[in-house]
Structures are given as C-alpha cells and as structure tokens.
C-alpha cells in the first residue's frame, strides 16, 4: 500500500502542469527588430554593430549594451543608448511585429489545459509592447521580466521566479526556449526544456535541452506530458 501511495505521489510531482515561455525569437519574431533598433541607436551615436555581433553578444550570451561598450573601450552613455534603442524598438513593433510560426495556435491549445507563464529578460515596456501587439497577454497567469529578477538569463532566476509564482515545482514545469542562454538558465533551474531554434540561433549549443524541435508546430500536449 505504501509503495502505491509513493508511486502516485511521484507521478503527481513529475506531472507537467505548467509551461514557461520565452518571448523574443520564440513566440514573437522580434530579434531582427531588436537588432535593427540597436544598429540605428549606435549609428546615431557614432558606433556600429553587425548582425553577427548582435546575435553573439545579445542573443547567445545574454549580455547588454553596458558590456558591449566596455568591451570596446568606448565612451558612450549606455543609458542614452538604451533609451534611444527602446524608442526605436517600440516604433518598429507597431509596423513590423509578427508571431513566430505556430505560436498563436499553441497558446490557444494550451491555455485551458496548462498553467502558462512568460519569462523574458527584456524590459517591461518591450514585453508589454509585444504582448499588446500580438494580443496574447491574456494567455499568461504569470509574466516575469528582466527587471523582476536579480540576474537575467543564463542565470536561472527568471524561470525559478515564474515557477514559484505559478505555484509549481520545477519538476512540474517545461520551458520553451529558442536560445542557448535560455537553455542554460532552464537547466540550472532544474526544469526540463524544449529548444526551438530560429534563424538567429540555429548554431547555438542545445546539448542541455531535453528535446529540440524545429518549430512550435511540433509541440503537442502529448509531447509535453510524456517528456522525460
């Protein structure tokens, strides 16, 4: 009898109740917009960043403008640059924003069946702009942004915060991510993770992911519930 009770308890603890979504490059095709906004802001301040540099520094490593300036020995004002970039990015969202393939259908499929959280390292205004533009804010019980935690990805803080606010154990969650920094963060948080690479992240190291899928269209309830 005790063995049956223990087995039932372990099944419940491991049951997937909650899905934690990344935003940029996973649900929304916004990495190109972030890149364009940084390029325009830096150009206006007499500097330049290539697409490849942006992909490596921001998307892969999760570093920010302050580190980028410091590494190059520049004397630019990171606060002014970030403000310029933010204004331009929000402008671009109004005209260029689009969802990633399969994103809206997946959210609709999971909405009434799992608890959903959004965990994005971006600033709140950028997150709110994307959610409003795509009309998807109502899908999420919990939204955690980069200003809500001490350290952003690849640190695990943002996923741990999302799980805690959902009232779920790490073993009951699955993270959906498109970038190496997010995969590392999920791994450090002890949460299973499915990687869905995009154009900017196909060359990333996804060896820590529980599974790799080519598109959000491959994510199903059956896949989530049977993920080992």
Describe these PLM feature segments:
Residues 14-105, 111-112:
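N-terminal helical cap/lid subdomain that shapes the substrate entry/recognition surface
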Residues 27, 99, 116-119, 151, ...:
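Conserved SAM-binding loop
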Residues 92-97, 121, 189-190:
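Short, flexible loop segments at the rims of nucleotide/cofactor-binding pockets, characterized by
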């Amino acid at each position: 009898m005790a063995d049956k009770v223990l087995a039932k308890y372990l099944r419940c603890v491991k049951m997937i109740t909650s899905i934690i979504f990344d935003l940029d490059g996973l649900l929304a095709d916004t990495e190109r917009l972030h890149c364009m906004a940084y390029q325009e802001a830096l150009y206006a301040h007499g500097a330049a960043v290539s697409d490849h540099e942006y992909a490596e520094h921001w998307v892969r490593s999760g570093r920010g403008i302050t580190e980028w300036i410091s590494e190059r020995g520049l004397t630019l004002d990171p606060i002014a640059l970030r403000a310029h970039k933010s204004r331009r990015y929000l402008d671009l969202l109004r005209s260029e924003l689009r969802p990633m393939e399969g994103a809206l259908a997946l959210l609709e499929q999971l909405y009434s069946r799992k608890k959903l959280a959004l965990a994005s390292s971006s600033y709140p205004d950028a997150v709110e702009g994307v959610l409003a533009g795509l009309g998807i804010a109502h899908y999420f019980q919990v939204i955690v942004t980069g200003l809500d935690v001490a350290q952003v990805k690849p640190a695990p803080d943002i996923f741990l915060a999302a799980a805690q606010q959902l009232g779920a154990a790490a073993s009951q969650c699955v993270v959906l991510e498109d970038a190496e920094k997010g995969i590392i963060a999920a791994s450090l948080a002890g949460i299973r993770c499915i990687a869905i690479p995009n154009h900017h992240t196909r060359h990333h190291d996804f060896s820590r992911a529980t599974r790799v899928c080519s598109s959000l269209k491959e994510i199903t309830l059956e896949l989530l519930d049977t993920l080992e």
